[in-house]
Amino acid sequence: MKKYTDLEYLKLSKWERFQYKFLSFFAAIPVAIWNLFKGIGGFFKKVGLGVANEAKDIWTTFVEGDWKTKLSYLVMGFGCIARGQVLRGLLFLLFEVVFIGYMVLMGAGYLGLLPSLGTKGPYQITEKIEYLPGRFREVVKTVTYADDPTVDNSFKILLYGVLTIFFIVAFIYTWRVNVKQNKIAEGILKSGKKLKSGKDDLRSMVDDKFHATLLALPLTGILLFTVLPLVFMILVAFTNYSSAHNGGETGLFHWVGLQNFQTLFSWDVGGVNYSATFGEILLWTLIWAFFATFTNYFLGIAVAMIINKKGIKFKKVWRTVLIMTIAIPQFISLLYVSKMFTLNGLFNGFLMDLGIIHTAIDFWGQPTLARVMVIIINIWIGIPYLMLIATGILMNIPADLYESAKIDGASGWKQFSKITLPYMLFITGPYLPTSFTGNMNNFNVIYLLTGGGPHVNLSNGAGNPGDTDLLITWLFNITQKGFGEDGAQYYLASVIGILVFIVVAVISLIVYNLLPSVKNEEDFQ
């Protein structure tokens, strides 16, 4: 395919430009795929070289180090303590003691059971209960983990098994830092310099390393409350974990490999068409995200331009009125609006009183109408945010650009399309994929307005999906209502969560890299 220079491209007609861009997009796909695999290969090569260099450095440090350094390979912190860095050495030693204690008391056991997720499940016993003097009856009782600690708990095995792996990785990293510290300390002493004392270490925590001190707690929180649950959720997708495995005779769950992914993409499993259900909900989710993003974006800009227009009075009043929708919690406003449009709601009553309609309109009972309604109501919610963003940007567009355009005879539409819109896209471009992602996971609007209903076209499926359900609300219903004998299907919800992430990540990366603010950032500056 021939590549045009900038001058040649400008000479093309609009249709030829469109054709050129269209063909260029598809021509770039093989190159992009090749670069992707090339990047993946380069990443693994870089990781391999990094591991090899680390291993070489560890061996060299051990061979060339003194006896204090060598002993630190076994007893963390020994070299630091022996060289007078007592505080640093005690922290290393304490971490090692805690790690060994955890592994002996809990970690090793859970890690050993991780491949099977437990073998001893809840069991039944028969008890004799005296209900009258000298008269007994037999009662069958199920003994669970709560009654007998020797019964395996698959949930805890998976959770603590993952936590143990995290702990092992943290220990290896800390051990490596311990080795490096000994190498550095040995080199400093050989050069005749003095090592930092415990007071110096504490002082540096609020001085040159203050950033590390501030980030320590947030990073720990992210690891424990974001990364760990995320890994746990991903692993659940490869098990048969459901509410049926929370206790009773089926308290254990096991690894099933890719079976859950196969189930989701199967046409018929136990009378349920998972693949068609997932496809329809995914399509509606993408349609919803598209309209929810771009209607709010362009209408928000339009409202900001109208309010900012010269001659418009009470600008602060109009902005305040719009901001009121932000000030009121969505939980309250959306539930109220939902009730307004019911069969016996305020809106139907108002139209009937005026004689416009004689039969109440079922806004939430018709699939197409319900979908249109949630998009319209989302516009009411989202416009004020974009209005505020656009107002600030519009005030910063140089006025001389518009004056020059007027002198050249540019119409209002030309000024908008050639000055305002490009400027807005440069500044707010990254907001679009962010907003699109947020709308794909917009739980509040759908759940509070329709609850996912009506249940007309998608009545048969896990979680009882509705016609306005997004992937995120369907996922939620699967974890609450479930379907069939398994009850709440946590494994299926995890699979959907992984697929949602993949879809959102791919779309966001593609759109982000096509934005003018990314491609032409230097030109704008």
Identify the function of each model-found stretch.
Residues 62, 111, 179-183, 438:
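Generic hydrophobic, helix-prone segments enriched in Leu/Val/Ile
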Residues 14, 21, 62, 66-69, ...:
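Hydrophobic, aromatic-rich alpha-helical transmembrane segments
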Residues 106-114, 210-525:
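A structural signal for multi-pass alpha-helical bundles of membrane permease subunits
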Residues 2-42, 46-56, 74-82, 86-89, ...:
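N-terminal signal-anchor/first transmembrane alpha helix
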Residues 59-152:
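Ordered, small/hydrophobic-rich secondary-structure cores
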Residues 59-60, 202, 457-461:
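A short, mixed-charge helix-start or loop-turn motif at secondary-structure junctions
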Residues 121-125, 129-166, 266-283, 361-367, ...:
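Membrane-interface segments at the starts/ends of alpha-helical transmembrane spans
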